[in-house]
């Protein structure tokens, strides 16, 4: 008899759990697993403060040490999803690993936006920029397709156990990044410098890295540097709960307004 594919569901709680997310999790856990799948310790959660890099790193460690799961499904607590969408994402990961080499991550799509609601929603996908470590937001993409990208946000993705183990073997947190919370440490390092221009340059670099390489992009940079590939299924859309529920319809309306002279592709 074929062994089931074992799945662990992981979540990081930075402050609070959104009600849309709570309802999604309840519906998921109240249902049985599809044929060919089994839970590996069910839900693994990590409570953390604003340091998401630390929380996500602990989640990978708990996944490896506390479960025998083949994959870890990471869905942030401000996402809304259905059980069907959850298992379709897992199934996409499983099939992608069978059909392609070196697939480490498969993700769905969610969007980021400021206020008001249609203030330029952007998908959580990036392609490689001109230089290593630089990324360009992917604004438009083929609908309902599996595409390869350079980086994704960590809001909804499936990570292979071998990816987590790779970083555990190196004893590093792959989500670690330079952030503004590191300024006190940075100030200690440069306190002895007497060149104001050098100090200003270093501070600007720290802010740039914090803006451009948060914990999710830092993670993806290390994943691809290790030889793993990152795929996204653009048909799997996860609404992002802000002060409103930001979904694919909002994104498509914004794209059509942004490019009114182009034929709609989404």
Regions found by a protein language model. Give the residues of each.
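N-proximal low-complexity "stem/linker" segments adjacent to membrane-targeting elements
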Residues: 1-50
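Short, high-confidence coil segments that cap the C-terminus of an alpha-helix
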Residues: 68-69, 98-103, 228
């Amino acid at each position: 008899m074929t062994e089931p594919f074992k799945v662990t569901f992981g979540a990081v709680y930075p402050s609070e759990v959104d009600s849309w997310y709570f309802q999604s999790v309840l519906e998921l856990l109240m249902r049985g697993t599809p044929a060919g799948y089994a839970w590996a310790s069910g839900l693994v959660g990590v409570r953390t403060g604003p340091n998401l890099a630390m929380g996500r790193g602990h989640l990978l460690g708990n996944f490896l040490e506390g479960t025998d799961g083949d994959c870890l499904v990471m869905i942030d607590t401000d996402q809304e999803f259905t059980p069907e969408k959850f298992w379709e994402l897992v199934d996409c990961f499983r099939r992608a690993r069978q059909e392609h080499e070196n697939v480490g991550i498969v993700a769905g799509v969610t969007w980021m936006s400021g206020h008001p609601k249609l203030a330029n929603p952007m998908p959580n996908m990036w392609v490689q920029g001109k230089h290593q470590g630089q990324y360009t937001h992917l604004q438009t993409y083929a609908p309902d397709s599996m595409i390869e990208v350079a980086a994704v946000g960590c809001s909804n993705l499936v990570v292979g156990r071998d990816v987590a183990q790779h970083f555990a073997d190196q004893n590093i947190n792959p989500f670690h990044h330079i952030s503004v919370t590191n300024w006190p440490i940075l100030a200690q390092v440069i306190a002895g410098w007497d060149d104001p221009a050098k100090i200003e340059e270093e501070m600007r670099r720290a802010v740039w890295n914090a803006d451009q390489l948060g914990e999710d992009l830092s993670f993806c940079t290390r994943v691809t540097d290790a030889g793993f590939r990152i795929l996204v299924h653009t048909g799997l859309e996860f609404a992002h709960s802000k002060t409103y529920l930001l979904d694919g319809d909002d994104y498509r309306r914004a794209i059509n307004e942004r490019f009114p002279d182009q034929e709609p592709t989404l």
